[in-house]
Amino acid sequence: MSGPSSWRRAATVMLAAGWSHASPAGFRLLLLQRAQNQRFMPGAHVFPGGVLDAADSSPDWVSLFAPRHTPPRFGLGPEPPRQPSFPGLFHGDADGAALPDDVALRICAIRETFEEAGVLLLRPRDSARASQEPSIALSPPAGLADWRSRVRSDPRCFLQLCAHLDCTPDIWALHDWGGWLTPYGRSSRRFDTTFLLCCLRETPRVEPDLAEVVGYKWLSPSEATECFLSKEIWLAPPQFYEVRRLENFASLSALYRFCLDHPLEVPEKWLPIVLLTSDGSIHLLPGDELYVKGSDFLEKNMSIDKKTEEIVTEGKVVNRIVIHSPHLYEIYMTLTSKSEHGYPKSYTAKKSCTARL
């Protein structure tokens, strides 16, 4: 059985980029296809990211950020309040850590994006951090394959790459978005993953590493939904939920402006509780009337001797993902939020979609 001490911390970045072609979609998201031989979510389309490494909080980063950006915050703004995201899963900065937790997680996401996709979210060391426009990814360096191999073998080499390019990780371009904890039973490997968002003016060149990642797609939120329903791609429930949440924004500028004007004071991290019904399953999320706060379901699922449709019909206050099949999810939502970030709208698949599944 997996316990709290066995959870692995991770960071992922949702890259939203402008689109040069005529299209009603205001932006597209980078989704990477994981290789089938991967232990966790084989074949899935995911946002770039990976596991936090000790190298991501190395004190050597301090001198690279200097002199323009100094500790402890390196210009990120006020430190977010520390509070447990879930009982038994409190993560504060390690005692004596050279970098704050949210800085290290950003470096992790940027490093993993380079490893998996060859995209460099860096900026010149002497550049100002403030910008009223989305960022631009750095062009891949000469010897991309060699550098990527070195970083994959030893994450400390990512700092060497940044020093070689006279750049720093563009931690200021990554905005807090939220986070997800792997629910019980999804996999023997469980992750505490911070979700970040980065807006880019244009789509950068993507070069999958052809090891962990074998392909990629740039898709608008609506396109990603359609590709999922048509079985062209597979999304895990958290990715599907976030794709639908991003549907709230009509354009890249609206999304970027929201990130600048509404920084999250306390980024939420959710643990879905899996409710097993007699004919399917439902992922219950915080705020749902059936969601149980506390650690009771950290290591087990809920179950009920009712059909999924009965549970859906009875629901009054809901925030849930109904899993009908691997390629058919529905979102039921009655909660309200003061901002676009809050929640996705309810989403039920069209009958034409269900007929072909």
From Swiss-Prot:
Catalytic reaction list: an acyl-CoA + H2O = an acyl-4'-phosphopantetheine + adenosine 3',5'-bisphosphate + 2 H(+); CoA + H2O = (R)-4'-phosphopantetheine + adenosine 3',5'-bisphosphate + 2 H(+); hexanoyl-CoA + H2O = hexanoyl-4'-phosphopantetheine + adenosine 3',5'-bisphosphate + 2 H(+); octanoyl-CoA + H2O = S-octanoyl-4'-phosphopantetheine + adenosine 3',5'-bisphosphate + 2 H(+)
InterPro entries attached to this UniProt entry: NUDIX_hydrolase-like_dom_sf (IPR015797), NUDIX_hydrolase_dom (IPR000086), NUDT19 (IPR039121)
EC class of the enzyme, as a word: hydrolase
Primary site of residence: other
Any single GO CC term annotated in Swiss-Prot or TrEMBL for this entry: peroxisome
Compartment(s) where it occurs, according to its Swiss-Prot or TrEMBL record: Peroxisome
Motif Microbody targeting signal, chain ranges: 355-357
Cofactor section: Mg(2+); Mn(2+)
Record-listed N6-succinyllysine modification sites: 300
Site feature (Important for coenzyme A binding) residues: 34, 40, 189
CDD domains attached to this UniProt entry: NUDIX_AcylCoAdiphos_Nudt19 (cd18870)
GO molecular function: coenzyme A diphosphatase activity; magnesium ion binding
Keyword field: Hydrolase, Magnesium, Manganese, Metal-binding, Peroxisome
Transmembrane feature ranges: none
Binding site for Mg(2+): 112, 116
BP GO terms, sorted: butyryl-CoA catabolic process; coenzyme A catabolic process; malonyl-CoA catabolic process; medium-chain fatty-acyl-CoA catabolic process; propionyl-CoA metabolic process; succinyl-CoA catabolic process
Description of how the protein assembles with itself and partners: Monomer.
Function: Fatty acyl-coenzyme A (CoA) diphosphatase that hydrolyzes fatty acyl-CoA to yield acyl-4'-phosphopantetheine and adenosine 3',5'-bisphosphate. Mediates the hydrolysis of a wide range of CoA esters, including choloyl-CoA and branched-chain fatty-acyl-CoA esters and at low substrate concentrations medium and long-chain fatty-acyl-CoA esters are the primary substrates. Highest activity seen with medium-chain acyl-CoA esters and higher rates of activity seen with the unsaturated acyl-CoA esters compared with the saturated esters. Exhibits decapping activity towards dpCoA-capped RNAs in vitro.
Similarity comment: family membership: Belongs to the Nudix hydrolase family.
Protein name as annotated: Acyl-coenzyme A diphosphatase NUDT19
